[in-house]
Amino acid sequence: MDLVVVNALIREEVQKPNSTTQERTDMEYNTTIGVDVSDKTSKICVMAKLPGGERKIVVETTCATTKDGFEEAFSKFDRSWPVIFETGTHCRWMDKCFRNLRFKTIVANPGKIPSITKSNKKNDRNDARELARLGIADPEMLHPVILRDEIFQKMLRLHHARNLLVSQRTQKVNQIRGFAKSVGYRIECKTTEGFHNQSKALWPKELEEVAWPLMDSLETDNLKIKAYDKMIEKLAEEPEFKAMVERARVIYGIGIIGSTVLIATIGGRPNRFTHARDVGAYLGLVPQQDQSGEVDKQLHITHAGSDICRTALVECAGVALMSNAPETDIKLKGLRIAMRGGKTAKKKAKVAVARSLAVTIVALLKDMTKEYIPLSKAGEEGFKRYHAELEYLTMQKAAKKEKAEKKAKAA
């Protein structure tokens, strides 16, 4: 079906009399193209809006999920019709392909479209129809996303690859420690980077055949991780990254890994957030809510957004909260939360500091001329009160312990 036939079909539907309106042939109408993508084939639905508000499916077809397949199928369609498809593995190259064909693209966020994710009749054809229908009804209902530039996507790919190697190295180290404990041997090395430097002569013979092949692979993993670190550092020197990375690293605890992964995750566009604090929800570092009346449950964080970015920020938070770290407003916030006590107080403190780090970085990137003050006067006073309270609590614990010891001796 060529473009002339498709346009004729749309014109014919528009010119039909409608039971609720007078016959009109000059009314404008909208046409959208919904595409539901799978690895091998994609479903295409062209939908037009008629004068009475009715939506008519004009064309439904299938094409191969390849550049050639899309070029052949979309050569029949008018370039003024927007192409709507979901985020996913193929969305980046598809967006580039459609733009090269001079189509406007709308990349939908399926996680925020209940009519697709929670449909009882979910299939590829219906998904393509729903995308086209929502594009006509209200494009904002598609929750459009802006894809990152290639250089930021490249940085994220480097971080994903590095993160995979780091997790594999950690699994190997834990497995070797488990082998050692099973034969009554304890490995003293505390760092994963130097774990492979263990002396073979000091190891029990029962572990040689099992553990040493893993130890050799650890050395290879370390070399690969260092290679990725160098690639990340090199890419961070590019103009798109350099100024923002230097700006982010003025905050204690933020290194090359934490700064680059956050900048890449937000696509180098800090102004996408109306308020800097919005980045906390974007990265899933805010708690879920379930409140009704007087009941307000304490829930876990949402874990939305990028896992590797969230993990990197939590690791940076651990550095910022170390005892030898300088006193900052961010550190004070974490120490206050940790002082509350309880099983999860320290974890909550890390998450809160991670969120504060992300918010502070975005605020600095939104205004590159703003001066960063690590510790304000209010923060200085806060640390004085914190140390006084900590000393008081320490004395209380010591008094309770002494009282318990006296009671035990008397018994």
Where are these regions (language model features)?
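Phosphate-backbone recognition surface of nucleic-acid-processing proteins
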Residues: 246, 250, 256-342, 346
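Nucleic-acid-processing active sites and adjacent nucleic-acid-binding tracks
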Residues: 51-81
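Gly/Thr-rich phosphate-binding beta-strand-loop-beta motif of the actin/hexokinase/Hsp70
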Residues: 28-49, 131, 165
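Short, charge-rich amphipathic alpha-helices with coiled-coil/heptad character
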Residues: 138-156
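Short alpha-helix plus adjacent loop in nuclease-associated cores
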Residues: 106-144, 198-199, 295-304
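Glycine-rich, often acidic, oxyanion-interacting loops/wings at catalytic, nucleic-acid
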Residues: 2, 160-247, 381
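Low-complexity, acidic/Ser/Thr- and charged residue-rich accessory regions of DNA metabolism proteins
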Residues: 294, 335-411
